[in-house]
């Protein structure tokens, strides 16, 4: 299981621990990943994602999972998120055709 946010693509970063004597040792900065179920308003169901806390804030800032997926470019999303996005677009097209 990789340590990458499924919605934002945020992953691990490499840096240094720096001592008082300015000695540098390699270290890794990991994103704060949480397993969450995000609800889709248009599909009326929940989807499980492994998301960073920054990603959760971004989703809420954009008005929910549906708006976030529609605004985000495909290359930033995981395969799981892309499946949900395709399903969402399909449901929206069917709703437009029925109306």
Curated annotation (Swiss-Prot):
List the GO terms this entry assigns under cellular component, sorted alphabetically. Answer: cytosolic large ribosomal subunit
One GO term under biological process is:
translation
According to the UniProt entry, its GO molecular function terms are:
structural constituent of ribosome
Its keywords, alphabetically, are: Ribonucleoprotein, Ribosomal protein
Identify one Pfam family in the record: Ribosomal_L28
Show the SUPFAM superfamilies listed in the entry. L28p-like
Q: Which InterPro entries match?
A: Ribosomal_bL28 (IPR026569), Ribosomal_bL28/bL31-like_sf (IPR034704), Ribosomal_bL28_bact-type (IPR001383), Ribosomal_bL28_sf (IPR037147)
Q: Which family does it belong to?
A: Belongs to the bacterial ribosomal protein bL28 family.
Q: Which PANTHER family match?
A: 39S RIBOSOMAL PROTEIN L28, MITOCHONDRIAL, LARGE RIBOSOMAL SUBUNIT PROTEIN BL28M
Name-wise, this protein is Large ribosomal subunit protein bL28
């Amino acid at each position: 299981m990789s340590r990458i946010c499924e919605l934002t693509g945020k992953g691990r970063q490499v840096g240094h621990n720096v001592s008082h004597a300015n000695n540098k040792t390699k270290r890794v900065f990991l994103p704060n990943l949480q397993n969450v179920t995000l609800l889709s308003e248009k599909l009326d169901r929940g989807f499980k994602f492994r998301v960073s806390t920054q990603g959760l804030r971004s989703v809420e800032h954009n008005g929910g999972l549906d708006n976030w997926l529609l605004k985000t470019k495909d290359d930033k999303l995981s395969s799981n998120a892309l499946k949900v996005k395709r399903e969402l677009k399909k449901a929206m097209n069917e709703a437009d055709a029925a109306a």
